[in-house]
Amino acid sequence: SSIRKFDLARIEEEMVYIAKRCKKSDELIITDLNFGMYQQDVETAKSLANTMQKYNWPIHLSAAAGKNKPDRLIEIASILDGAWIIGSAMESSDTDVLKAIKRGNISKKAFNKVLEHGNNSSPYAQTYTEIILAIPKDSKETHFNSIRYGMKHEAKIIRMFQAILLLGTEMATQKTRDEHELETQYRVIPGSAGLYKFFDEKIPITEIEEIIVGNSTMSFEDYLDCRLMNLIVESFYNNAMFEEIYAFLYEMDILPLDIFVYLKDHPKIYPPKIKQIMDDFIVSNKKNLFKTRKELEDFALNEKTIKKFIDAEIGINEILVGKSSLYSQFESMVELLITSVSGYLRENDKMSACTQHYLNELGRFTVFR
């Protein structure tokens, strides 16, 4: 098979056209799911760098990186001089999971090389990796291990996604569903509900997707536990607000995930408002799911319910709402994190009076900063 490509002259012309007219956005999104795989991408990067230098646009570049071409990715990232945040989607770090989804993943050596370059390129680097929850053969253990793998290789951002069954894909076939005992439910995509007027009639419309919430190796309860961990990682890890605390942990050969597991498994240490946010998060994850498409359509496709979707009373992005709610309790977040670190260290005979004093001071510094 062959890949159709635009010639470089056309690409240059289009970038200049956009740069001259773009006034309200500093970001360019390249809709190539494997940018950096081919030599032409290097030439595109050089052209883009010239455009950036001449027009001071774009400031940021968003593009999904190709896999198993680390040297080329690094070359392109160097050409773009920090404008492109590099990382790689690994879906899972588990070999059996990758085999089940027939995914030729980026090699561990290449993965590490890309992240190392990205992290060394700037003190403010935001390298990333991406993981998908509940795909065939995934389990609570393998999902947590994938998060651990990303942290071990110092990915600054770990993006965790739910598995969507797309019509026409192999994963959505009855054969795959049966083979891996996929448990699925339906939901309205957050922000994808509206009431539209056609002539004299108001028609409620939603966009519905089917997601995997369990399989032969992951129960629904394990799925919810993983979702809670995803909220913790997104809120406590991804935004670099606690990087001094994690730097201290790395010096002790402790990964942030070790602390997050302790935090998740000890709800009795949660400050009251944090406890309520965590509980509401789990409730929302259950409430927004429906066993069948018909059940969801019967519930959603009426004017009263659609207005609730529009007003974000229902059908919310649970991670986004949970994260923003946690940030509104920032001092309590710091208190909980320091308490979790202290508890983990005591549990593993690594605590001392000096360490406890340092942690307390580190917590105060984080709040006052």
Residue ranges: model-predicted function:
Residues 8-129, 133-136:
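Conserved SAM/AdoMet-binding glycine-rich loop
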Residues 34, 38-39, 96-102, 133-142, ...:
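Flexible glycine/acidic-rich beta-alpha junction loops that bind and position SAM and/or redox cofactors
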Residues 71-74, 143-146, 213:
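Short alpha-helical segments and helix-capping/turn motifs at coil-helix boundaries
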Residues 1-9:
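Canonical Radical SAM [4Fe-4S] cluster-binding loop centered on the CxxxCxxC motif
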